Amino acid sequence: MGLDYILVHVTYNIPLAGILTLVYWPFMTRLDWQKISTLVIISLVATIPWDSYLVRHRIWTYAPNGVIGWTLYDIPSEEVFFFIIQTYNTSLVYLILTRWLVLPMYLGTVARKETLIGASILLLAISVGLIALCFGDHFTYFGMIITWAGPFLLIQWVFSSGFIIALPKLELMVSITLPTLFLWTVDTISINQGTWTVEAPTKLGVQLWSGMDIEEVLFFLITNIVIVFGLVCIDYAIAMATCELVQSPQAVQSFPSYFRVLARFVTNKYHPDKQFVASLRKAVDRLAASSQSMYMGSAMFQGPFRIDLILLYSFFRVADDLVDESQDTESARMIIEQCDQLLEAKFSHPELFPFSPGYQEAKHPAPPELIAAIDSLPVSRLRLEHLKGLIEGFRTDLTFSAKPGSFPFVTESDLDTYAYHVASSVAASMLGLVVHHFPDHQFAINVFLRRRVVDAGERMGQTLQYINVARDIARDAAINRVYLPTTWLKQQGLGPEDVLASPTDSRLELVRDRLLDRAEFLSASAREEMKFLPDEVQGPFLATVDSYLEIGAALRRGMRPRTLDDKLRLPLGTRLWVAYRAMAWRK
């Protein structure tokens, strides 16, 4: 009886599990626990018979003073725990690295050729393993590894090869490589200390470095591949269920249970719409490139709700860019009117869009990206009046160029109204989606509570817009726009014309601080109501708001973009910490 193997866990495996859990805990969902539990159960069921054979036939042996003596089918309890902790740690590494991925955008990849080639290679490897077992002796352990793990990899590849190929390679490679390197190190130390041994008559006798047999190198590599591919298969099933639900025209969207998702994956004939997947991919790329706060905020959400949000955010981004980048006032006005008409058509005849009645008679065709963005909107789960608010905000923007020298923001009330139209529309639309995706939550059921929370959400939206104005004083001045209330400017001895002439005037810092004060006040006044949102929404919503508030804090510290044309962007580490803090506070 000894504690050597236990000390390996206490020294290496358990601390790593603790660190990974601490890192991912704020973002952990019930679905994540279910995925990990599934892999742990499969690993135990698949490994115990195999490992029991290895121990009973003395392919693996343990020092008598290295284990405590408790066994399961002759397997030391420490070894059984190892299967659990390896699966847990590798799963967490995968979850951390792939949290930001929008899984449905990787659907639809046809990989028949790659599937056939991969399956052929795996069948060949299994055949080699069987031949090695027939030879026995020094080929025994090598053959046992290949013939045991090969069929699992073959099944995973046949079911999910297209999805595996479509996923980002870096995340998959790192998810496999990091745990493997760690376990190679732990295994080398343990073998050199004599905690366990691969017996000489059953191994090839080739060591890649001192104490590390080539079979052990292969074992840890192939088991981590099996774990990661197992998680990918589950994510494939979840992505299919998510895509099917998002494409449904039904207003109420309840995500099916975990086991139902897996069952439908095996039996369902659903094929994702390639056009929808392509539109989703473009929406994700657009947000990642032009709206980091919204993109990172969306990564905190999960499932169909996240997809609806991305499509909504993408529409706002497309419309805003088209208006801002118009060549002249008339072009911008045309874009706004086209957007208004297309929204009316989409909400009136979603099944006919974009060939709705009246659309084909338009004299000037709308930009294809605007049509695509509106066509992707989940209109059965949105309200037209919320999106119309954005249109009103665009019309306000036009007054700058329609009347040179005209500055529509005279008082704080004017800015409040504009912020309500532009940003509160986003918040109200988002909270409207919550009703459809969480129909059994008190927020959806209690109308009076919902009205209270939506009011608070709209104030949160105004918070974001105030910070945008404070951040973009110079950028707006470059296109002859001043969103600062004239009454505020006069108190500093300035006018809108002075802002256009010198957007870096030191006196504007007091106006900027006032904008940030207003943003912080609006945020503080609305934060308490956010606790009535579903847990799945509350943390991510606050994480998005807090990322904007952090931009405000950076502005107060004097942080500025490198050039006047750029937006102030927070370092990645800061954005991750803000998201972590907000999600941890929710937990």
UniProtKB/Swiss-Prot annotation:
It is a multi-pass membrane protein. The chain crosses the membrane at residues 5-25, 35-55, 65-85, 91-111, 116-136, 145-165, 218-238. The keyword Zinc does not apply. One of its GO terms (cellular component) is membrane. SUPFAM superfamilies: Terpenoid synthases (SSF48576). It is found in: Membrane. Its EC number is 5.5.1.19, 2.5.1.32. Pathway: Carotenoid biosynthesis; beta-carotene biosynthesis; Carotenoid biosynthesis; phytoene biosynthesis; all-trans-phytoene from geranylgeranyl diphosphate: step 1/1. Residues 1-236 are annotated as: Lycopene beta-cyclase. InterPro entries: Isoprenoid_synthase_dom_sf, Lycopene_cyclase_dom, Squ/phyt_synthse, Trans_IPPS_bact-type. The keyword Isomerase applies. It catalyses: all-trans-lycopene = gamma-carotene; gamma-carotene = all-trans-beta-carotene; 2 (2E,6E,10E)-geranylgeranyl diphosphate = 15-cis-phytoene + 2 diphosphate. In the N-terminal section; belongs to the lycopene beta-cyclase family. Bifunctional enzyme that catalyzes the reactions from geranylgeranyl diphosphate to phytoene (phytoene synthase) and lycopene to beta-carotene via the intermediate gamma-carotene (lycopene cyclase). NCBIfam families: CarR_dom_SF. PANTHER family: BIFUNCTIONAL LYCOPENE CYCLASE/PHYTOENE SYNTHASE (PTHR31480). This is Bifunctional lycopene cyclase/phytoene synthase.
